[in-house]
């Protein structure tokens, strides 16, 4: 049963499939025709090239050369070859060309006896040799050329190619300029104002620079010019090469010298003896107590007893140092005096420099300088205040000895030297003035000092006797003693070992003569004022002076 709507809908699909099949069929037919038209391709072989060369050499028909017909059998060709070989053999033929004729006969026979090569020869007879339109023609010519001929041919080809490339570059630039000129003309006609004058000037310069290739642009001329310029520049090139080689040698020598110097420095550093550090004196370890306000010694003891204990400890320490220090010779003493003149009072680090020159410790040098000063300033008839003090102390009853705490004073070589610097700077000025003054002046000063030392104990004895009878004077003196003791006690209790060390370091850092010295020292010691530092310093100086007076 036919439905009207569906039949009309299917009909166009059938038509499309028929059209598609009709368009594909001609393509298949065209491909088959092309495949059938293609002939088998055969390349030229070495046998073909030898055959072509033989044909050109003989310049005769091979069949005519043997005396046979073209359709002759191989047996007939063999018989003809034997007959001709007997006549053309060099042993029987005395002709000059006998060898070449016999060689050609053998080559012709080799071609005709083989059916395949004979068939190729027949094709040559029909079609002839390859002409100039075939590549094998040129190949056969090139095969016969020598090396020189090949080089010449290659050079000619390169020359022609180079000249053609030069012309192509020139024409290309000319074409670009022509197109650019036309574009500019169009822009001018349209009235566009975007044309830049600089671009126009550059294009005109390029047009002027364009030059047609000349005969000297040929490759042989270029090579000749390059060769001449190379010969001219050859001396300069040789000179530059020599300079470069000399610089290279210098750099190599410098590198070797640097390497040797480094090795020597390393060996010297290895050979250097390790400096033995001097053993630092062992100080008693300070252990802070939980109760910092606990008294470390009996405040009822006098300052003289504390000084005696301090002197005993310092004497024991000095004895050990004296054992280690070498003895002083006359040369050492003269060197000491010269160094003291060289480094006068007020010089920063004076005693360190003097000790460095003498090769001794600072304490050893300062003690010896003090001894020299005492020996110069004192006379045999003088009585020292320290001797009177010691006599007075011996007459007093002995009290309980108390140990001096470590936080009062810290003895070190550097710190002792620094404080002794402060003491001896004034003394050195006296020593230098005493050495420069005349002898009568010394006698006067010695007598005056003697008188002072004699008057002082008398005044003290008188004062003591008056105080025994005068109650007000006794009270005043007791008040003064109490105040002095309270000050010393406050100074002793308030100063810790770390603060004492900081004070000693600050005294070394800011020597005598520095501006705002005590302000800077007070800044270095925490929680201490300028007055505290000065009072502490005075106390330490008094202790050291008393110790030295007792020793002397």
Curated annotation (Swiss-Prot):
Location of the J domain: 56-129
Topology class, membrane: Single-pass type I membrane protein
Pfam entry (one): Myb_DNA-binding_2
Phosphoserine modifications at: 379, 477-478
Single GO biological process annotation from the record: protein folding
GO molecular function, one term: protein-folding chaperone binding
Domain of life per record: Eukaryota
Locations listed in the record: Endoplasmic reticulum membrane; Nucleus membrane; Microsome membrane
Region (Disordered): 370-495
Signal peptide as annotated in the record: 1-43
SMART domains: DnaJ, SANT
Record's keyword terms, sorted: Chaperone, DNA-binding, Endoplasmic reticulum, Membrane, Microsome, Nucleus, Phosphoprotein, Repeat, Signal, Transmembrane, Transmembrane helix
Biased composition (Basic and acidic residues): 453-470, 480-492
Cytoplasmic side: 171-552
UniProt feature coiled coil, ranges: none
Main location: endoplasmic reticulum
Expression sites (tissue/organ): Widely expressed.
Domain SANT stretches: 323-377, 490-545
Residue stretches spanning the membrane: 150-170
Ranges of the Lumenal topological domain: 44-149
Biased composition (Acidic residues): 419-431
A GO cellular component annotation in the UniProt record: membrane
Subunit structure: Interacts (via J domain) with HSPA5. Interacts (via cytosolic domain) with ribosomes. Interacts (via SANT 2 domain) with SERPINA3; the interaction delays the formation of the covalent inhibitory complex SERPINA3-chymotrypsin, but does not alter the catalytic activity of SERPINA3. Interacts (via SANT 2 domain) with ITIH4 (via C-terminus); the interaction protects ITIH4 against in vitro cleavage by kallikrein.
Function of the molecule: May modulate protein synthesis.
Protein name as it appears in the record: DnaJ homolog subfamily C member 1
Source organism (scientific name): Mus musculus
């Amino acid at each position: 049963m036919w439905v009207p709507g569906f039949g009309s809908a299917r009909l166009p699909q059938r038509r499309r499939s028929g059209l598609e099949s009709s368009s594909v069929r001609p393509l298949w037919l065209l491909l088959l025709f092309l495949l059938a038209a293609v002939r088998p391709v055969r390349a030229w072989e070495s046998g073909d090239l030898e055959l072509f060369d033989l044909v050109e050499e003989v310049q005769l028909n091979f069949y005519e050369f043997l005396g046979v017909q073209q359709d002759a059998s191989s047996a007939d060709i063999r018989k003809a070859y034997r007959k001709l070989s007997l006549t053309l053999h060099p042993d029987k033929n005395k002709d000059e060309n006998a060898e070449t004729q016999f060689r050609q006969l053998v080559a012709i026979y080799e071609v005709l006896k083989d059916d395949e090569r004979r068939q190729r020869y027949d094709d040559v007879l029909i079609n002839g040799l390859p002409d100039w339109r075939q590549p094998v023609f040129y190949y056969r010519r090139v095969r016969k050329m020598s090396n020189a001929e090949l080089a010449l041919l290659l050079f000619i080809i390169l020359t022609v190619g180079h000249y053609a490339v030069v012309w192509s570059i020139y024409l290309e630039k000319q074409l670009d300029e022509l197109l650019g000129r036309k574009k500019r003309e169009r822009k001018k006609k349209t009235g566009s104002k975007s044309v830049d004058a600089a671009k126009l000037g550059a294009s005109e310069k390029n047009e002027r620079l364009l030059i047609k290739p000349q005969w000297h642009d040929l490759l042989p001329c270029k090579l000749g010019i390059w060769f001449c310029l190379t010969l001219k520049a050859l001396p300069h090139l040789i000179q530059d090469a020599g300079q470069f080689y000399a610089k290279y040698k210098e750099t190599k020598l410098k590198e070797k010298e640097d390497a040797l110097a480094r090795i020597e420095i390393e060996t010297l550093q290895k050979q250097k003896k390790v400096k033995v550090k001097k053993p630092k004196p062992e100080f008693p370890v300070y252990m802070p107590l939980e109760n910092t306000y606990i008294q470390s010694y009996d405040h009822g003891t006098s300052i003289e007893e504390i000084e005696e204990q301090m002197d005993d400890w310092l004497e024991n320490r000095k004895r050990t140092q004296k054992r280690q220090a070498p003895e002083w010779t006359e040369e050492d003493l003269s060197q000491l005096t010269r160094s003291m003149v060289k480094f006068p009072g007020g010089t920063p680090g004076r005693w360190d420099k003097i000790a460095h020159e003498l090769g001794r410790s600072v304490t050893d040098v300062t003690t010896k300088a003090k001894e020299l000063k005492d020996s110069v300033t004192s006379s045999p008839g003088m009585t020292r205040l320290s001797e009177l003090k010691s006599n007075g102390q011996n007459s007093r009853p002995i009290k309980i000895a108390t140990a001096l705490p470590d936080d009062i004073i810290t003895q070190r070589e550097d710190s002792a030297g620094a404080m002794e610097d402060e003491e001896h700077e004034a003394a050195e000025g006296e020593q230098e003035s005493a050495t420069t003054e005349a002898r009568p002046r010394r006698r006067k000063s010695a007598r005056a000092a003697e008188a002072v030392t004699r008057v002082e104990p008398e005044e003290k004895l008188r004062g003591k006797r008056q105080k025994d009878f005068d109650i007000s004077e006794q009270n005043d003196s007791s008040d003064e003693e109490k105040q002095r003791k309270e000050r010393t006690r406050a100074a002793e209790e308030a100063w810790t070992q770390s603060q004492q060390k900081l004070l000693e370091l600050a005294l070394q850092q800011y020597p005598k003569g520095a501006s705002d010295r005590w302000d800077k020292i007070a800044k270095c010691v925490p929680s201490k004022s300028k007055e505290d530092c000065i009072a502490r310093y005075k106390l330490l100086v008094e202790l050291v002076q008393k110790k030295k007076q007792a020793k002397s």
